[in-house]
Amino acid sequence: EEENMTQSRTHTCGSLRITDVGKQVKLVGWMENFREVGSNLGFVVLRDFYGTTQIVATDEEMVATFKGITKESTISVSGEVRERSSKNDKLETGDIEIVPMQVEVLGKCRFRELPFEINRSKEADEAIRLKYRYLDLRNAEVKNRLILRSKVVAALRKAMMDHDFMEITTPILTASSPEGARDYLVPARKHPGQFYALPQAPQQFKQLLMVSGID
């Protein structure tokens, strides 16, 4: 079958199972770790949004290739799925590993030493976490909170829609209406010297909707 050149990967790092043994696959992810066992054997943990997959380098050339790649670099790995000799029951992909035939660095991480270990980012200083937020969000625990929030919001929205509620989005820029708090002003591009403000509450917009008959 001819390869689709527009497809960056055939599977995610969390999708391969024992039933995929023998398949030729292509994964894209961040190199979480490389453990060198010998000159012709090494293990890579490849991670993306969906999980991790073990890559096993079985020759000197491939071991040298992975040794030259910094942690958290974005790489593409093409190879064959095989059954692991020692399985990891804690991982959904723990029954398999990939024997790579081709490795391509898509984006090299410029840090030889990361500002913090990805899986322990919550222990880092808050200012450092915010500065390198894109690394912090690769932490599964942090990422899963975003996923949970998305599911909760979706469930609430569905429940409200099932009760015939209608979702309305009110403007995020309006005329300034100073109250107790200071307005956050945004200059008007077409009207020099005038400003929009972030609304402190959607009260007026909701009242307009009620007068319009939307109850």
What are these regions (language model features)?
Residues 1-215:
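Class II aminoacyl-tRNA synthetase catalytic cores and aaRS-like
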